[in-house]
């Protein structure tokens, strides 16, 4: 997929791929930390991938103006997208913010912005790492 095609995707599609990419970052990180027991992997992964965690990261990013205008456009596209899925363990606002978070990961991945995606991951890691067991 080229950049133009990626930029035309709706927020839900961007969040769909962004969710998968972010999950891989988290799983690799946890394995690199030496976690191998499924219960510990799941417990710690949730601290990164839950809607509440992603909303916390976005809030921290907002405090320091981390997101570029380009990224904010795709965050809003994801956040404002009308999804047929409902929030499971959180409120609708938090769920929508997390969808925006995943949309940013999706657009960065699909447009091959690897360095910026790494910066996004590093910021996310720094924000959540203190909560790990």
From Swiss-Prot:
Species the sequence originates in: Lactococcus lactis subsp. lactis (strain IL1403)
Classification lineage: Bacteria, Bacillati, Bacillota, Bacilli, Lactobacillales
Biological function: Involved in correct processing of both the 5' and 3' ends of 23S rRNA precursor. Processes 30S rRNA precursor transcript even in absence of ribonuclease 3 (Rnc); Rnc processes 30S rRNA into smaller rRNA precursors.
Entry GO MF terms: ribonuclease III activity; rRNA binding
Active site location: 19
Keyword Electron transport: no
Keywords assigned by UniProt, alphabetized: Cytoplasm, Endonuclease, Hydrolase, Magnesium, Nuclease, Ribosome biogenesis, RNA-binding, rRNA processing, rRNA-binding
GO process terms (BP): rRNA processing
Subunit structure comment from the entry: Homodimer.
A GO term from the CC aspect: cytoplasm
Main location: cytoplasm
EC number in record: 3.1.26.-
Subcellular location: Cytoplasm
Cofactors demanded by this protein: Mg(2+)
Domain of life of the organism encoding this protein: Bacteria
InterPro entries given in the database record: Mini3_fam (IPR008226), RNase_III_dom (IPR000999), RNase_III_sf (IPR036389)
Homology family: Belongs to the MrnC RNase family.
Protein name (Swiss-Prot/TrEMBL): Mini-ribonuclease 3
């Amino acid at each position: 997929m080229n950049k133009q095609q990626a930029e035309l995707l709706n927020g839900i599609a961007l969040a769909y791929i962004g969710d998968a990419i972010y999950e891989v970052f988290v799983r690799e990180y946890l394995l690199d930390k030496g976690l191998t027991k499924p219960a510990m992997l799941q417990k710690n992964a949730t601290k990164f991938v839950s809607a509440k965690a992603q909303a916390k990261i976005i809030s921290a990013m907002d405090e320091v103006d981390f997101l570029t205008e380009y990224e904010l456009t795709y965050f809003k596209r994801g956040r404002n997208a009308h999804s047929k899925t409902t929030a499971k363990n959180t409120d609708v606002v938090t769920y929508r913010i997390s969808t925006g978070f995943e949309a940013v990961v999706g657009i960065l991945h699909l447009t091959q912005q690897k360095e910026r995606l790494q910066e996004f991951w590093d910021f996310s890691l720094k924000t959540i790492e203190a909560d790990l067991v």
